[in-house]
Amino acid sequence: MTFRLTRALCGAMLALGMMVATIAPAAAQYWQCAPYAREISGIQIFGNANTWWSQSEGKYAHGAAPKVGAVMAFKANGRMRVGHVAMVSGIVSDREVLLTHANWSRGGQIERDVRAIDVSSAGDWSEVKVWFGPIGDLGQTRFPVYGFIYADQPAAEKPMQIASLSGGSSAQKLRK
């Protein structure tokens, strides 16, 4: 092998190595469900998914009706020990929604607009089945759900009574 050929091969390998090193960090993004749901919904709650429902109390309105942009909060269950959160990206019917979420079908990956159906006997979204990529269909597992946290609605403001600074017995009611 000539010096020129060796030098050219080394240069090509170095250039290829730099391209792979540049691409690798972006391709290696691994999303957990909670940080991804926070990123796309704007709901500023931190910690494991199974704590989002209780943490939303007093900060965000929540309920049993799905709305686009709301976060569906799953309870911890079986192999899903820390719960799950997913943003509602579409409403198909009163018992079917589309979810956008991470770390469900494949570890760390994002799935957009996948089906979830209400399988609760009361039709109250307390139990759902969710699309599972590896089988190309809804899974068999029925997942318990707390409900939906609404990103665009702050919790109802409650009056707060504070003492008067004048030393009198009158008090003022203020809104938070």
Q: What is the predicted function of each stretch?
A:
Residues A8, L16-A26:
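C-terminal segment of classical bacterial N-terminal signal peptides
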Residues I23-A24, I45-F46, V88, V97, ...:
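Intrinsically disordered, low-complexity regions enriched in Ser/Pro/Gly/Gln/His and often acidic
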Residues S93-K176:
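Aromatic- and glycine-rich peptidoglycan recognition patches
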Residues A27-M87, V92:
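Secreted/periplasmic proteins that engage bacterial cell-wall peptidoglycan
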Residues R4, A24, L165-G168:
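Extended, non-globular or repeat-rich regions with surface exposure
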Residues L5-T6, A49-W52, K75-A76, I117, ...:
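Intrinsically disordered, low-complexity segments enriched in polar/charged residues with Gly/Pro
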Residues T2-M13:
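Bacterial N-terminal signal peptides that target proteins for export
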